[in-house]
A protein has these predicted regions:
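Bacterial N-terminal signal peptides that target proteins for export
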Residues: 1-13
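Non-catalytic beta-strand/loop surface segments
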Residues: 23-63, 88-190, 212, 224-279, ...
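Active-site recognition of the HExxH zinc-binding catalytic motif
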Residues: 69-81
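A common structural junction motif
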Residues: 201-208, 300-308, 391, 430-441
Length: 563
């Protein structure tokens, strides 16, 4: 592919001008660490009297194991249930009811073990079927429900949210992904001490109120957001096929059998391990004085003891994939062809070149909030031009790199045009990849891709909340310095780098392919997740991001589960 020198020069000049215009937006991040190991990131911006607050727990579904999948997301729910003094009318009775519920649940698990064995032997079809319950189990469930009813009469619902609202705060929320759990709120700058007290109280005095009944809430959430969505379980199965060994194998929301059986004791152990201050990062962006803000952090969060054992490492690594993996499914959703290639983590040295490659093939990245998606990218890139405009074989074609803490994927996908089938457009995708492998990219494509990534990077840093989210994403896969370094890493990418990573990672043996066709063989179907959108996962809001903070913003969001 050849392009005029004039177009190339124009693109380079535009890039340089844009970089100069944004030089004033470089972040001045003050990093401090409390004696208990909690990291604090402070960014002073005095354009409005507010502060975007958040604290990040470096824990997500990747830190789980079979038997407790979904626990990271369940804990996100638990952190909104109040503390020993917030959220209840009678703290002593509330704790006693928790103890009684634990005792009954232990007996319920014994009965469930009996049913599990019966199902294994074929004596019953489904241990979760109410018709399979033993009389003893029915009695225990009724006793447990009575305890839940009594506890709910003592609960002051959403008390923490009400306290925040009464003090002018907005946006109290949280989200869970594979690598992090993030708790956020926006406050008036005069209420920073209130925030420090409330959030440190959540960490210092948790009670895990309604733990068991909340499991049912999450099971229903799973049914609504995954199982009942067209193609939801197919995408879940495709993700599990793609990640064979690594904990990315399961969705953030977890397997239903694990959610239904996880215990408060397991939850308490999980909390003590992953919610200790030496595994947390607080992020404050806005109208603040760094020294005064740090003093408040020390006063309130400093009282929480560290976990001397630290966090166990995620040791399971994804093995080298020996051959192409394929899944063909008939589902009630728009047909598509998708190929996910094993790539690298967000902080890997090849991540920047893969980001550029994603923009060349798929178009400009989204500029919305990291981890939450954003405006759909405009149709552009080589795949759109070739498959949609020139060949008219597809109605949409996309590509993106998504790097996470422990691994990454480079994904290409397309929706066939009327009269076309996924199996017909699949080789058209590969043909465009092969062109990059064989011939590389042009200077103009490189310049435009870098400019697009730079625009996305700085656009995300225009607001306090955008800075907060970008810093959190960087901390979840590496450190905030990766965010600061991302523009120069992108700028250092050469045409040779892009061709090299295409040759290295876009190989048949490393890809997992999903072809979906409409049941009955029809070409049109119900809406599905857009190609190039959030990967198979729970809901946007986990699970994606950014492709990691290095380099610059990702072209695709990271699968997250919100609240």
């Amino acid at each position: 592919m050849t392009l005029s020198r004039g177009r190339t020069l124009a693109a380079l000049l535009a890039t340089a001008a844009f970089a100069l215009s944004l030089s004033a937006q470089e972040l001045n991040v003050v990093e401090r660490t409390l004696p208990n190991g909690m990291k604090v990131l402070l960014v002073a911006r005095h354009d409005q009297p507010t502060i975007s607050c958040g604290w990040l727990a470096r824990v997500g579904s990747a830190n789980e194991r079979p038997g407790i999948t979904g626990l990271a997301h369940l804990f996100e729910h638990m952190m909104f249930k109040g503390t020993k003094t917030i959220g209840t009318k009678d703290a002593a009775r509330d704790l006693e009811l928790n103890r009684l519920q634990d005792e009954v649940q232990a007996l319920i698990r014994e009965e469930m073990a009996v049913l599990r064995e019966k199902q294994r032997r074929g004596e019953i079809a489904d241990m979760m079927d109410p018709a399979a319950r033993t009389p003893r189990l029915v009695e225990l469930l009724a006793k447990f429900d009575a305890l839940v009813t009594e506890q709910r009469a003592l609960i002051v619902k959403d008390e923490m949210d009400k306290i925040y609202q009464e003090n002018g705060s907005t946006g109290l929320n949280a989200s869970t992904s594979q690598d992090r759990t993030f708790y956020i709120v926006g406050i008036p700058s005069s209420k920073l001490e209130l925030w420090a007290w409330l959030e440190s109280d959540r960490l210092a005095n948790p009670v895990f109120r309604e733990f068991y009944s909340e499991r049912n809430v999450i099971l229903e959430e799973r049914r609504q957001t995954l199982e009942s969505r067209p193609g939801g379980t197919v995408n879940e199965a495709f993700n599990a096929m793609t990640w064979m060994a690594h904990p990315y194998h399961w969705q953030v929301i977890g397997w239903p059998s694990d959610i239904a059986q996880v215990t408060r004791e397991q939850g308490s152990e999980f909390f003590a391990t992953y919610y200790a201050p030496n595994n947390l990062t607080a992020i404050l962006v806005g109208d603040l004085d760094p020294e005064k803000a740090y003093a408040l952090m020390e006063k309130y969060f400093g009282r929480i003891p560290a976990n001397p054992k630290g966090v166990p490492p995620v040791v399971t690594m994804e093995p080298v994939q020996p051959a192409e993996q394929r899944m063909v499914a008939e589902v009630e959703m728009t047909p598509s062809a998708e190929a996910a290639y094993k790539a690298v983590p967000a902080v890997h040295g090849d991540a920047a070149a893969l980001q550029v490659l994603g923009v060349v093939l798929g178009g400009a990245p989204m500029t919305g909030r990291p981890g939450m998606g954003g405006p759909a990218r405009p149709p552009s890139g080589r795949l759109h031009k070739a498959l949609v405009l020139d060949q008219k074989a597809a109605t949409r074609a996309s590509a993106y790199f998504r790097g996470q803490k422990y691994g990454g994927l480079f994904t290409v996908s397309a929706t066939p045009a009327p009269g076309k089938r996924p199996v017909e457009i699949e080789p058209l995708l590969y043909a465009e990849l092969d062109k990059v492998v064989k011939d590389g990219i042009s200077d103009d494509e490189l310049a435009r891709a870098k400019n697009a990534l730079r625009v996305a990077h700085y656009t995300r840093l225009e607001s306090n909340s955008g800075i907060r989210e970008s810093l959190a994403q960087a901390e979840s896969s590496g450190t905030y310095k990766d965010l600061l370094d991302s523009p120069k890493k992108v700028e250092a990418v050469t045409r040779e780098d892009v061709q090299r990573v295409a040759k290295k990672y876009l190989v048949k043996e490393s890809r997992s392919v999903l072809l979906t066709t409409r049941k009955g063989g029809g070409g049109e179907g119900m809406p599905r997740r857009r190609p190039g959108g959030p990967p198979p996962g729970v809901m946007p809001g986990a699970a994606p991001s950014s492709g990691g903070p290095v380099p610059a913003p990702a072209a695709a969001p990271v699968p997250e589960v919100k609240g």
